[in-house]
């Protein structure tokens, strides 16, 4: 009986708080609350702003290099493993892949911001 009373009280209190949370904001409707705010930009303007493709390519390149660096982070703990040759081979492979990727991006001028 005590458990049933506790569950009923908690459920009633939770439902009461939910109803108050939905009902209370509708009492005071202001123009500022009903209009969208987009960080100081005019929300009623054009939604199709020009997007820099160079910025997109630099951002994707950053994400790829960041992922490769994240793969290198556990290497100090991998040194403590039993198979040191495998760990060193994988580390050398990841570092050479990172260097080759950077060299390719550099030769293709993917990191150049100004044209």
Curated annotation (Swiss-Prot):
Pfam families associated with the record: Oxidored_q4 (PF00507)
Record keywords, A-Z: Electron transport, Membrane, Mitochondrion, Mitochondrion inner membrane, NAD, Respiratory chain, Translocase, Transmembrane, Transmembrane helix, Transport, Ubiquinone
Localisation per UniProt entry: Mitochondrion inner membrane
Annotated TM spans: 3-23, 55-75, 84-104
Enzyme Commission number(s): 7.1.1.2
InterPro entries named among the record's database cross-references: NADH_UbQ/plastoQ_OxRdtase_su3, NDAH_ubi_oxred_su3_sf
Taxonomic superkingdom: Eukaryota
Gene Ontology cellular-component terms listed: mitochondrial inner membrane; NADH dehydrogenase complex
Position of the signal peptide: none
Bilayer topology annotation: Multi-pass membrane protein
Catalytic activity: a ubiquinone + NADH + 5 H(+)(in) = a ubiquinol + NAD(+) + 4 H(+)(out)
Similarity annotation: Belongs to the complex I subunit 3 family.
Name of the protein described by the UniProt record: NADH-ubiquinone oxidoreductase chain 3
